[in-house]
C-alpha cells in the first residue's frame, strides 16, 4: 500500500471529536493529505494518537508509512506504539544517577534501543531480587545521560511480570548489578489489542 493510502486508512480510525493540545483535529490532517504533505500529516496523526488511545491498525499503518518515507525515528515510535497497543503502556519519571555513582558515563539514545534490567519487586524462588528486562523510550528528548531526569516509557520483554505495577510504585534501573537510576511509575494502562498467541 502506498503512503497516502496508509495515512488515509489511519485517519479513518481517528474520532472526529478529538483535538491535540494545539487544537489539531483530523480535519487538519485531511487538509495536509489533500496537498500531499505526507510528513506533516504523519506527525499530526502521531500527535492525535497521543491524545486518545487508538487501535493497533492505526499505529501499524503509521509505522509502514514512516518506513516508506524513510523517517526512522517516526517509524521506531510507531512500532513502539504498536507494542503498547498489544501489551499496555507503562510510563515513569526516571532519574539517572550521576556518572560518579553509576557505570554509565555517556548519554544513551532515547529511541527505544537501551534494554536495561529493572528491579520491579519480583523475587527468585530463593528470595533474591529478580531483575526484569524492558526497553526504554525517553519522551520529548533525543538522549538521556548520567544525572539527568526524564519521562520514559517501558516495553517489558515479559509484560506479565509487570502487571502488578501501579502509579506511585518506585522501581530501579540496572545496566549491571548496581542501581543506575530510580523511576516512579506515573501511568499504567492495559493493552488496546489482544496479544497474538
PLM feature segments, named:
Residues 85-197:
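C-terminal effector/interaction modules appended to NTPase cores
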Residues 1-88:
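C-terminal-biased regions
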Amino acid at each position: 500500500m502506498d503512503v497516502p493510502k496508509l495515512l488515509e486508512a489511519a485517519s479513518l480510525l481517528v474520532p472526529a471529536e478529538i483535538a491535540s493540545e494545539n487544537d489539531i483535529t483530523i480535519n487538519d490532517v485531511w487538509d495536509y493529505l489533500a496537498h500531499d504533505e505526507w510528513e506533516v500529516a504523519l506527525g499530526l496523526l502521531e500527535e492525535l494518537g497521543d491524545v486518545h488511545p487508538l487501535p493497533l491498525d492505526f499505529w501499524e499503518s503509521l509505522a509502514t508509512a514512516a518506513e516508506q518515507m524513510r523517517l526512522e525515528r517516526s517509524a521506531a515510535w510507531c512500532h513502539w506504539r504498536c507494542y503498547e497497543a498489544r501489551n499496555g503502556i507503562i510510563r515513569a519519571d526516571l532519574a539517572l544517577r550521576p556518572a560518579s555513582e553509576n557505570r554509565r558515563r555517556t548519554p544513551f539514545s532515547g529511541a527505544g534501543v537501551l534494554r536495561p534490567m529493572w528491579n520491579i519487586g519480583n523475587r527468585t524462588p530463593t528470595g533474591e531480587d529478580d531483575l526484569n528486562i524492558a526497553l526504554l523510550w525517553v519522551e520529548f528528548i533525543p538522549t538521556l545521560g548520567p544525572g539527568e531526569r526524564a519521562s520514559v516509557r517501558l516495553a517489558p520483554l515479559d509484560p506479565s511480570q509487570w502487571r502488578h505495577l501501579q502509579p506511585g510504585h518506585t522501581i530501579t534501573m540496572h545496566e549491571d548489578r548496581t542501581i543506575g537510576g530510580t523511576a516512579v511509575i506515573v501511568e499504567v494502562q492495559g493493552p488496546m489489542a489482544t496479544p497474538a498467541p
